[in-house]
Amino acid sequence: MSLGKVVQIIGAVVDIEFPQNNVPAVYDALRVTDGDLTGLTLEVQQQLGGGVVRTIAMGTTDGLRRGASVMNTGESIQVPVGKATLGRIMNVLGEPIDEAGPIGEEDRMSIHRAAPTYEEQSSSVELLETGIKVIDLVCPFAKGGKVGLFGGAGVGKTVNMMELIRNIAIEHSGYSVFAGVGERTREGNDFYHEMNDSNVLDKVSLVYGQMNEPPGNRLRVALTGLTMAEKFRDEGRDVLFFVDNIYRYTLAGTEVSALLGRMPSAVGYQPTLAEEMGVLQERIASTKTGSITSIQAVYVPADDLTDPSPATTFAHLDATVVLSRDIASLGIYPAVDPLDSSSRQLDPQVIGQEHYDTARGVQTVLQRYKELKDIIAILGMDELSDEDKQLVSRARKIQRFLSQPFFVAEVFTGASGKYVSLKDTISGFKGILNGEFDDMPEQAFYMVGSIEEAQEKAKSM
């Protein structure tokens, strides 16, 4: 329990001098013990020599003065874990921020842990049904897998994420952990009330480090959430871990890296980008005891998927759901691009031949339609062969049938949400591909659940 004193403050980075025979280790948590900011937690990042350590503040440093005394706790940041965290909102340090009293946890764990060893890990090919047609058809999720929702600003990552949580949390009765990393406070608030209204709040732990927080909070809050998820997994449960947004985690790392004086790499990102991403992603793993299924929203800067941040994230995922601005501009929601999205599970040996053939058939028709669009724009539909005209008609029906009303968007759209089973999804698209619905107007397929609903809608048109 050595004491040190603050010698330099540069924004969120604070240098502290300790006796040379008692210097804190990297990742040790330090606590300010006097002045206006008593209780502020700092995390050691570097040892500079001469007894001085460089730390990142887990809160605002406004009002911190040089000479303030700081105590070494002798351990890394410890957060509450276990059932006591369910239904609660916590910050990066595991402190409650929902004004509902103390957490009352029985156990605490360090946010810095090693990933499961090679022997402990296990893989699964069991599918996780989401009830969202386009995802179940084209990029199915695996239980215990990692999924990324990629998209630029305002194409619906958070709404898709909330719908997935609602569907999976209600249909799958396990526990979930939600880490809000550098997102809007309003969305965090909406999310809390959405979970409360759906009666699934008692199965979700919420950890928030919002946009207005210092970079230290946003960098560590994903690890706090992950630690809680790991505890549920180690108890033998199948847990869902949601992160919104992984890009803000990278961005916080960039801010911290610049403050620590590291030389930036490509596009101004931190030189340790791949390592920081790896440290987080490798811990999100399923073991022989239990599984973590992770769904992560990934903001794509300027809609450029080759940007180093989304590109680094791609390498760790089993399924990628790419949201497209072009599809959103057509009014088709969820705006998932069925040609850009992919999944490792899309294999006939995993999902079965019928599902595989239907998914590939849908992609083939949409790809051909994409190629014909230029010809249609220049020469018009009349110049196409009869075969191509039929293909375009089916493609437009498929495109509209890939849309569906969401439960979490009911307040905005006025349409009641739909959960579509995988069996209904496959039979619907198979029917369109086989020409069973060629006589129906394409508008009948827009914003419906199953194909039976489209048939009902067509009767009234």
UniProtKB/Swiss-Prot annotation:
Matching PROSITE patterns: ATPASE_ALPHA_BETA
Principal cellular location given in the protein's record: membrane
Enzyme Commission number(s) from the entry: 7.1.2.2
Gene3D superfamilies xref list: 2.40.10.170, Bovine Mitochondrial F1-atpase, Atp Synthase Beta Chain, Chain D, domain 3 (1.10.1140.10), P-loop containing nucleotide triphosphate hydrolases (3.40.50.300)
Superkingdom, taxonomy of origin: Bacteria
Gene Ontology CC entries for this record: plasma membrane; proton-transporting ATP synthase complex
InterPro entries: AAA+_ATPase, ATP-synt_VA_C, ATP_synth_F1_bsu, ATPase_a/bsu_AS, ATPase_alpha/beta_chains, ATPase_F1/V1/A1_a/bsu_N, ATPase_F1/V1/A1_a/bsu_N_sf, ATPase_F1/V1/A1_a/bsu_nucl-bd
Catalysed reactions listed for this entry: ATP + H2O + 4 H(+)(in) = ADP + phosphate + 5 H(+)(out)
Family the entry assigns: Belongs to the ATPase alpha/beta chains family.
Record's subunit section: F-type ATPases have 2 components, CF(1) - the catalytic core - and CF(0) - the membrane proton channel. CF(1) has five subunits: alpha(3), beta(3), gamma(1), delta(1), epsilon(1). CF(0) has three main subunits: a(1), b(2) and c(9-12). The alpha and beta chains form an alternating ring which encloses part of the gamma chain. CF(1) is attached to CF(0) by a central stalk formed by the gamma and epsilon chains, while a peripheral stalk is formed by the delta and b chains.
NCBIfam families noted in UniProt: atpD
The protein's name in its UniProt record: ATP synthase subunit beta
The organism of origin for this protein: Pseudoalteromonas translucida (strain TAC 125)
Taxonomic lineage of the native organism: Bacteria, Pseudomonadati, Pseudomonadota, Gammaproteobacteria, Alteromonadales
Record gene name: atpD
